[in-house]
């Protein structure tokens, strides 16, 4: 996706990442692609859900990321690549976070409370549309 954006020469205002499968994108956009003019000023929003996975991903994940020349301090959580630690890394490299589920784990909720970026708490489907618009305007684009 990132290379497609580069080929089209289209600089997005916001990139909204959903769930753990895309959770490494904020890290890569801020580090590996950090000097790309197309992403300068781009805001990254990550939505977090309660759909985690059991166990950990490949224990070599940190080695694979270091191969791309990214400083280990940027992904220190990934020494143990669990769902919680992958999402912590996404939060650390996002400009804003949205709680996409009402039942996040206690550990993830506690980490979100300490986040330095704006966090939109969960809203049910009847009210999330306006809440997202307001959040984007005031906290993401207005920040």
Regions from the PLM with identified roles:
Residues 1-143:
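Catalytic cores of nucleotide-sugar-dependent glycosyltransferases that transfer UDP/GDP/TDP-activated
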